[in-house]
Amino acid sequence: MATQFSASVSLQTSCLATTRISFQKPALISNHGKTNLSFNLRRSIPSRRLSVSCAAKQETIEKVSAIVKKQLSLTPDKKVVAETKFADLGADSLDTVEIVMGLEEEFNIQMAEEKAQKIATVEQAAELIEELINEKK
């Protein structure tokens, strides 16, 4: 006889640590004279900020940052880095279209509309640009 189930249990202690028992996929328990049951115990740790380095070249990131600053008329002292989101700089959808047009002109590329619409950060733009340049080679 086999029983299929899925469950999730979470226990929290006063020291802000959480023990979580979970089956993310249904578990199969079979009774053939033996008990097959396993639990996955893990302690949740408060999340920490994760910094991810980008795959795009620094030179590309800097060019994209300069174009974004120009298109949005930002002051020279405004910091625009790889992780910077266009929306955080006050860009709306029209501004984003203008940024994409500026990038296409500067790098002599054409971005497909569906890919261009997914760009939200300087890093994403730089990675897409490098991908398109490499495809042209």
From Swiss-Prot:
Residues 58-133 form the Carrier domain. InterPro entries: ACP (IPR003231), ACP-like_sf (IPR036736), ACP_chloroplastic (IPR044813), PP-bd_ACP (IPR009081), Ppantetheine_attach_site (IPR006162). GO terms for molecular function: acyl carrier activity. It comes from the Eukaryota. It is found in: Plastid, Chloroplast. It holds the Pfam family PP-binding. Residues 1-54 form a transit peptide. Disulfide bonds: none annotated. 4'-phosphopantetheine is transferred from CoA to a specific serine of apo-ACP by acpS. This modification is essential for activity because fatty acids are bound in thioester linkage to the sulfhydryl of the prosthetic group. Gene3D superfamilies: ACP-like. Keywords: Chloroplast, Fatty acid biosynthesis, Fatty acid metabolism, Lipid biosynthesis, Lipid metabolism, Phosphopantetheine, Phosphoprotein, Plastid, Transit peptide. One of its GO terms (cellular component) is chloroplast. Signal peptide: none annotated. The modification O-(pantetheine 4'-phosphoryl)serine is found at residue 93. GO terms for biological process: fatty acid biosynthetic process. Its main location: plastid. Carrier of the growing fatty acid chain in fatty acid biosynthesis. Belongs to the acyl carrier protein (ACP) family. Plants over-expressing ACP1 show altered composition of fatty acids, with significant decrease in levels of hexadecatrienoic acid (16:3) and increase in linolenate (18:3) content. This is Acyl carrier protein 1, chloroplastic. It comes from Arabidopsis thaliana (Mouse-ear cress).
